[in-house]
Amino acid sequence: MGKIIGIDLGTTNSCVAVLDGGKARVLENAEGDRTTPSIIAYTDDETIVGQPAKRQAVTNPNNTFFAIKRLIGRRFKDDEVQRDVNIMPFKIIAADNGDAWVESRGNKMAPPQVSAEILKKMKKTAEDFLGEEVTEAVITVPAYFNDSQRQATKDAGRIAGLEVKRIINEPTAAALAYGIDKKQGDNIVAVYDLGGGTFDISIIEIDSNDGDQTFEVLATNGDTHLGGEDFDNRLINYLADEFKKEQGLDLRKDPLAMQRLKEAAEKAKIELSSTNQTEVNLPYITADATGPKHLVVKITRAKLESLVEDLIIRTLEPLKVALADADLSVSDINEVILVGGQTRMPKVQEAVSNFFGKEPRKDVNPDEAVAVGAAIQAGVLSGDVKDVLLLDVTPLSLGIETMGSVMTKLIEKNTTIPTKAQQVFSTADDNQSAVTIHVLQGERKQASANKSLGQFNLDGIEPAPRGMPQIEVMFDIDADGILHVSATDKKTGKKQNITIKASSGLSEEEVAQMVRDAEAHAEEDKKFEELVQSRNQADGLVHATKKQVEEAGDALPADDKAKIEAAMSAVEVATKGNDKEAIEKATQELIEASAKLMEIAQAKAQTQGGAQEGAAKQSNATADDVVDAEFEEVKDDKK
């Protein structure tokens, strides 16, 4: 069997590692570098990947793609994608299914297609080192990636000729890299992962005893549209604004100038991590009727920090949520690990240090740790690494829409995966022959406030009164964090399935917003839940009362029947509104109006069921005696 390689498919840079002699080894690419820029360029006759693509970007900005990971598994109409549409030099378009795609030289391409080019280079790098074909890989994704984004990443692997054996979360991979050699003790580690395009925080417990190691993710949070690219963009916009003030020209309208500006901004940002001031000097950046124009701007570290301060602050809220979800305080964290190139910025390190009250570890390479962890996980899957157990989680709650537009959760956020959950539901109407299973992701009670992941129908339900059919809905999250849903009619055995596909993209900003909304609207959700409960109880009472009126027939006096029908109409009107008190008042009035109906029903039941009731009492008495005897016997034993 060939080697399974570990790939960190990053927004800005990618990295590949493999187990060599029992140790994870980061491999150098054809250019001699241990990391490869996640940049792809298309020319007339070839596809260029990595550093060569980066070098030619200035002369080919419209056909050079970077940060493509920010588009993977996303919808074109997402706010995050729309922001990128306005600043990227290449063309982002809407696919027929609404996904965000890109266009180069008239060719429309899906992000997984473009990402596959990076994976192909990683595959070739590993094959050159190993001297054999590579067909299997473990690929990392941000912990807060949703089902669509995970599925799209697997698709990219398949396009690159790789069977993706496992999708692993980036912070978890970094924890594996850090903890694999820690042979004794129990450590709780916070992994702060600020990469080129995504941010994750994971709280992970590493338990090492007698050679056995368990890596258990306690909680995770993040934002998959926050990273080094956003820091770069702040600096790019600042430089463009300064140039416009001085020269009156807007560089944003010139793709060639913007590509040069991007390179200069990235270089300046890196330099300011080790120096207090740098100069961006771009001669002949553009020209007008008066001649060529040059851009010369001095930037201090303090200026850069002021430009990105709010971005750094944005990373702190997920830290608080993750700690709360793990039921831990800052003092419970033993070690803090920094992952991702953007964590080299001193201001980021300072913010993390201040939050946790301790210095982050310096012995983890922020650019390579994730790939190393992926290679270790590959070793676990191939059997080369033993006595290591990895327990990851799903970042958001999953459920279905039920009666009253309520989201009923089947799997809560931060549940260890793989996992399964099932629950039995029923029909809302008499003789209902089909049900729609609407799959949702989020934390809100109101279905419409969550994200729709997909829906499907279960047909062929046999006619029956509402509430009688039993429809079992099963959620199954695999080890990659990808969701599979099935619905089965327990009587007929008829079954329907759905796997969440990339076309149902859910942006992580939406995910983060759902969690924030759930916290901010906890009281609102509670009131909505109570309203729906009252509405459902009222509907159920009307349904039952109608049946009892029919069964009572002529035994029900006309006056009482008229009162009951009027009360039922009042309830039906009330349930169409959103006034819980009005619904409950109308429900109580229906109960009171139905007093005569209850008397008739009880009298009828007593007449028809006397014999059965007597038998039941006898049976219960016997059963009670048996229980009492056992109970007494136990008590005697204790004495």
UniProtKB/Swiss-Prot annotation:
InterPro entries: ATPase_NBD, Chaperone_DnaK, Heat_shock_70_CS, HSP70_C_sf, HSP70_peptide-bd_sf, Hsp_70_fam
Protein purpose: Acts as a chaperone.
Disordered: annotated segments: 603-639
PANTHER family tied to this protein: HEAT SHOCK PROTEIN 70KDA
Protein name: Chaperone protein DnaK
One example GO MF annotation: unfolded protein binding
CDD domains linked: ASKHA_NBD_HSP70_DnaK-like
Pfam families linked to this entry: HSP70 (PF00012)
SUPFAM superfamilies noted in UniProt: Actin-like ATPase domain, Heat shock protein 70kD (HSP70), peptide-binding domain
Keywords of this entry: ATP-binding, Chaperone, Nucleotide-binding, Phosphoprotein, Stress response
Coiled-coil ranges per UniProt: none
Gene3D superfamilies named in the record: 1.20.1270.10, 3.30.420.40, Actin, Chain A, domain 4, Substrate Binding Domain Of DNAk, Chain A, domain 1
Upregulation: By stress conditions e.g. heat shock.
